[in-house]
A protein has these predicted regions:
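Glycine-rich phosphate/pyrophosphate-binding loop and the adjoining helix
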Residues: 61, 141-205
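N-terminal beta-loop-helix "entrance" segment that forms/cooperates
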Residues: 46-63, 154-158
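Cofactor-binding loop segments of dinucleotide-utilizing enzymes, especially the Rossmann-like FAD-
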Residues: 15-17, 46, 116-117
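Hydrophobic/aromatic residues located in beta-strands of well-ordered beta-sheets
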Residues: 10, 41, 111, 141-142
């Protein structure tokens, strides 16, 4: 890929609940290659953090990594959400972080998607569910997601295809975010634009 002339900071969120493994290694390599092209990116692996459970508690009251992680998303120029497939969908740890994240943190922000499963049977599961959730936030989701499976790795090392599609996604996210930089969203997302519904008066007599 050609050098990247954008100045967008990417945050790569890996929604893993286990110790760093193949997906961590693949994303870490993609970040290094992006840096060589001039794109600044960093990896936040949820498997290495202590995040509170999204139970309505204000972020400032959580004595863990939740507030700092959400702040990293808020300050990002663009975000890449990566998840292993669990039960045909995204991981619970990533969904929990999304539940902790306020709507303005992702509103109008470019988001790329990466998922990984043992086979191709569930390649649309996490993508479909994440697109539904991100539409609620009013995020700008890249039209093509990356899906990796076991055949994309040899002895835990990502192969040529994995590196190529990740590099294309990183470059596409950075370019799209740069193109939209300063462009105000046309409409509020559903989460902010919905009006409260008043209860109907009960009929009498």
């Amino acid at each position: 890929l050609p050098p990247d002339t954008t100045t967008i900071d990417l945050r790569v969120i890996l929604g893993s609940a286990t110790s760093p493994g193949r997906m961590h290694r693949a994303l870490d390599g993609a970040i290094e290659r992006a840096a060589a092209r001039g794109t600044s990116a960093d990896l936040i692996d949820l498997g290495t953090l202590d995040l509170g459970f999204a139970a309505g508690t204000p972020l400032g009251d959580l004595d863990d990594d939740s507030a700092a992680t959400v702040a990293a998303i808020e300050s990002a120029g663009a975000v890449i959400l990566a998840t292993p497939i669990y039960r045909g969908s995204l991981s619970g740890s990533l969904k929990n972080l999304i539940d902790l994240t306020p709507v303005p943190a992702l509103q109008g922000k470019v988001v790329g998607l990466v998922a990984m499963g043992a086979s191709d049977h569930h390649f649309l599961g996490a993508e479909r569910h994440l697109r539904d959730v991100l539409a609620f936030f009013g995020a700008v989701v890249m039209p093509v997601a990356v899906y990796l499976n076991g055949t994309d790795f040899v002895d835990g090392v990502p192969g040529e295809r994995a590196e190529t599609v990740l590099d294309q996604l990183f470059a596409g996210v950075a370019a799209t975010a740069a193109a939209l930089d300063g462009v105000e969203a046309l409409e509020e997302p559903l989460a902010l634009g919905a009006k409260a519904v008043k209860p109907r008066a009960r009929a009498t007599g």
